[in-house]
Amino acid sequence: MGRGKIEIKRIENSTNRQVTFCKRRNGLLKKAYELSVLCDAEVALIVFSTRGRLYEYANNNIRSTIERYKKACSDSTNTSTVQEINAAYYQQESAKLRQQIQTIQNSNRNLMGDSLSSLSVKELKQVENRLEKAISRIRSKKHELLLVEIENAQKREIELDNENIYLRTKVAEVERYQQHHHQMVSGSEINAIEALASRNYFAHSIMTAGSGSGNGGSYSDPDKKILHLG
């Protein structure tokens, strides 16, 4: 967890106050040195402790820096407040941004073929070169995307071919299974018919033999009528 926010107020304990002063003073001197080195700024720092001890830092001669400060304060050209300086800076930056926006808008209109009447031959040539470069980049990107789409389509075609092969294999397996099952059923039916025919044949033979022995071994035709004489 982060450290809690320290309340900025006078430290009552003198020992703690002195320890904090030493730490903060060293940090302040370090920051002043870093500012002078990183930003090539002329920095002068003067600190008096509660006991009246002087601490100072200057990347240049501190007296010359103080004199420069006095001169800057007395110079009428440097009497502007910080707010006025900031306002002037932001006004300049705002004007620069507006100019950049206007330039970009004009350039876009030129690329669209508008507002060309005010351009010279050289400027028109520059617009033409920009368009050619833009078209070249667009075509290159389009070609790249088309290659990706073709590659994806080829991969999809291979996947579909593999799926078709798999489905045809499964269909062939089902057809072979059905054909084998049909052959087994047909063979069983033929065997059953042959067995039934065989049983009927033997039963008919036995009945025929029994009828022949009861009539003295003579063949009796049931369709013939017997004439009895009185």
UniProtKB/Swiss-Prot annotation:
Mention any Pfam family matching this sequence: K-box
What keywords sit in the KW lines? Developmental protein, DNA-binding, Nucleus, Transcription, Transcription regulation
Disordered: annotated span = 211-230
Q: Which SMART domains match?
A: MADS
What processes in GO biological process is this protein linked to? positive regulation of transcription by RNA polymerase II
Where found in the cell?
Answer: Nucleus
- What positions does the domain MADS-box occupy? 3-57
Pull one GO CC term from this UniProt entry. Answer: nucleus
Give residue ranges for domain K-box: 87-177
What is an example of a GO molecular function annotated in this UniProt entry?
Answer: protein dimerization activity
Disulfide cysteine pairs (residue numbers): none
**Sorted alphabetically, which SUPFAM superfamilies does this protein's record hold?**
SRF-like
Name the residue ranges with Basic and acidic residues bias: 221-230
Function per UniProt: Probable transcription factor. Is required, together with TT16/AGL32 for the maternal control of endothelium formation, which is essential for female gametophyte development and fertilization, and seed formation.
Describe its assembly. Answer: Interacts with AGL15 and AGL16.
Give the protein name, as stated in the record.
Answer: Agamous-like MADS-box protein AGL11
Q: Which organism is it from?
A: Arabidopsis thaliana
Q: Which gene encodes it?
A: AGL11
